């Protein structure tokens, strides 16, 4: 069939960052992500023009998945951030804001993209080396033998998501539950390479947050009538389990384009049922106590198994198959033929449970590396946001188990890092440039743009007109409320720095963020007594933050290096 209209030529635009449309698009995107940042970030409601589901969030994962992006440059930016978030769960907004700030700041400089990219790479390498070094002044070790730092981690994630709508008491309760759920996934007698279990989040919407709880094992939601039909099992030893990933309904499988030849007088339904009953007889002879099926079990097979005191539960769904396999040690059975003895697994016990208006069949494991977090919240919107936040917190703990270090949060790492870069580029530029073709003047310009981008991320934490200061000893962030007097004694207005490590009773000098000041050496090597005495720190995941920093700089470099954008308009 011929085309109804002629094919349009592709649009080719050179120097895309110089166009007003691109700058406006990036500016709008920056304002969106900046306004969401931090504990007092503003919420966003996203929905399509045809109505339907409305997403209320301030999290980057939900925000970017619901945000329709059409411009190629913005697609590069959002895709990079989404890839980072899918791998690390945390620091998505940090990455987005830093990337936008870097692009915006260097555009004001009269430097070639090649020079900017080369120096950005040098500064990124300097940041990563410092944050991984023993002398880093914003990195603390994480002791998994103590719950204090771990609770700080979880609490920091929860308090940064205002759409969860948690009170302080609820935050403490959910933090403790998340930590307990994570610890339950760690094998007790693990040596060498550790394989973590899994935490399943079970929804209980419309309930009080304080009613949330954690149980070892897996909860299978069922109706009250179904639970009443299940026979109780009284056994002193473990219960033998068979897990089926194929249908046990007796339906004839789809033959595709093939032909099924059936002899005269043979009933396919009866033949299929006979095969199912033969399978049931093998399960009985193998002393199976519990049959779980991903799909449907034929009513006759169910009744047959129940007569022999075997519990049969169907319609488990694909989501629970992997956790059930891990917890029970079964190999999912995919055929109706003879079953290998190695396919069976076991559970310690089973029982019924009721939470709110929901009824569950509770599988209790032999070893608790699979657990269920029953998560409650007042409404669907708050629950959806809390679920995402809990998943992020659990992932952050997993990342920290691999690399047991934390960065000071609340903006203190960014201001400390900016102070360190300024000092390093002013006092030891040769160590950064080495044999590079760039000059010290170019380094100073890019370093200031880089530090300003970091400080702009920190500035995004303030949404209510307050001021942000940094001290001249540690390089930490300090917040002043909007209604504070213009001329005041700073120690009277400042209580703690952003991360909560230092208080204003020390003899410190402060200056406004982004004000002109002489570069200084921020104190490195955190004293252990300072970290040990702090009980309510705000912390960031080192692994996620380093990745976010790297993704932001590399994505900014990629966008700055674009010479042409070619769009197919057909």
UniProtKB/Swiss-Prot annotation:
GO biological process, one term: cilium assembly
GO cellular component, one term: cytoplasm
Region (Substrate-binding apical domain): 198-370
Pfam families xrefs: Cpn60_TCP1
Record keyword Chaperone present: yes
Record key words, sorted: ATP-binding, Chaperone, Cytoplasm, Cytoskeleton, Nucleotide-binding, Nucleus
SUPFAM superfamilies: GroEL apical domain-like, GroEL equatorial domain-like
Protein purpose: Probable molecular chaperone that assists the folding of proteins upon ATP hydrolysis. Plays a role in the assembly of BBSome, a complex involved in ciliogenesis regulating transports vesicles to the cilia. May play a role in protein processing in limb, cardiac and reproductive system development. May play a role in cytokinesis.
PANTHER family hit by this protein: MOLECULAR CHAPERONE MKKS, SYNDROMES PUTATIVE CHAPERONIN-RELATED
Protein name according to UniProt: Molecular chaperone MKKS
Source organism per UniProt: Pongo abelii (Sumatran orangutan)
């Amino acid at each position: 069939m011929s085309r109804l209209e002629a094919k349009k030529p592709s649009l080719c635009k050179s120097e895309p960052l110089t166009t007003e449309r691109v700058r406006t698009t990036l500016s709008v995107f920056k304002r969106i992500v900046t306004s969401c940042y931090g504990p007092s970030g503003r919420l966003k409601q996203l929905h399509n023009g045809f109505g339907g589901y409305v997403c209320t969030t301030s999290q980057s994962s939900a925000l970017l998945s619901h945000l329709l992006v059409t411009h190629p440059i913005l697609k590069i930016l959002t895709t990079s951030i989404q890839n980072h978030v899918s791998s690390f769960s945390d620091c998505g907004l940090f990455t987005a804001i830093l990337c936008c700030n870097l692009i915006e700041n260097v555009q004001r400089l009269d430097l070639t993209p090649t020079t900017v990219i080369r120096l950005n790479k040098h500064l990124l390498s300097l940041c990563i080396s410092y944050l991984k070094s023993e002398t880093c002044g914003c990195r603390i070790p994480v002791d998994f033998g103590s719950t204090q730092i771990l609770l700080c981690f979880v609490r920091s994630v929860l308090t940064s998501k205002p759409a969860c709508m948690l009170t302080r008491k609820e935050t403490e309760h959910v933090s403790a539950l998340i930590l307990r759920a994570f610890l339950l996934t760690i094998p007790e007698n693990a040596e060498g390479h550790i394989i973590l279990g899994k935490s399943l989040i079970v929804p209980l919407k419309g309930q009080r947050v304080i009613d949330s709880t954690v149980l070892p094992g897996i909860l299978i939601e069922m109706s009250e009538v179904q639970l009443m039909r299940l026979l109780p099992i009284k056994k002193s030893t473990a219960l033998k389990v068979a897990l089926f990933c194929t249908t046990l309904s007796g339906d004839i499988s789809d033959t595709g384009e093939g032909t099924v030849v059936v002899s005269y007088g043979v009933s396919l339904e009866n033949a299929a049922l006979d095969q199912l009953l033969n399978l049931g007889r093998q399960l009985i002879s193998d002393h199976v106590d519990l049959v779980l099926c991903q799909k449907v079990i034929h009513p006759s097979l169910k009744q047959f198994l129940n007569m022999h005191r075997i519990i049969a539960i169907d319609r488990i769904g694909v989501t629970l198959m992997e956790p059930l396999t891990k917890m029970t040690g079964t190999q999912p059975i995919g055929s109706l033929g003879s079953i290998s003895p190695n396919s069976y697994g076991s559970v310690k016990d089973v029982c019924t449970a009721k939470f709110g208006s929901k009824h569950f069949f509770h599988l209790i494991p032999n070893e608790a590396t699979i657990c269920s977090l029953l998560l409650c919240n007042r409404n669907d919107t708050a629950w959806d946001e809390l679920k995402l936040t809990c998943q992020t917190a659990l992932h952050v703990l997993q990342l920290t188990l691999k690399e047991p270090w934390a960065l000071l949060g609340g903006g203190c790492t960014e201001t400390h890092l900016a102070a360190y870069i300024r000092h390093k580029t002013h006092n030891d530029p040769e160590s950064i440039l080495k044999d590079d073709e760039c000059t010290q003047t170019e380094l100073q310009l890019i370093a200031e743009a880089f530090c300003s981008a970091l400080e702009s991320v920190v500035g995004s934490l303030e949404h209510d007109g307050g001021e942000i200061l940094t001290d001249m000893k540690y390089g930490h962030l300090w917040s002043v409320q909007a209604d504070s007097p213009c001329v005041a004694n700073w120690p009277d207005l400042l209580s703690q720095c952003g991360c909560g490590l230092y208080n204003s009773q020390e003899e410190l000098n402060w200056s406004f963020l982004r004000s002109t000041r002489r570069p200084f050496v921020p104190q490195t090597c955190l004293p252990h007594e300072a970290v040990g005495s702090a009980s309510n720190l705000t912390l960031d995941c080192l692994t996620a933050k380093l990745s976010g920093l790297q993704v932001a700089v590399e994505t900014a470099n990629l966008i700055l290096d674009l010479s042409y954008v070619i769009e197919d308009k057909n």
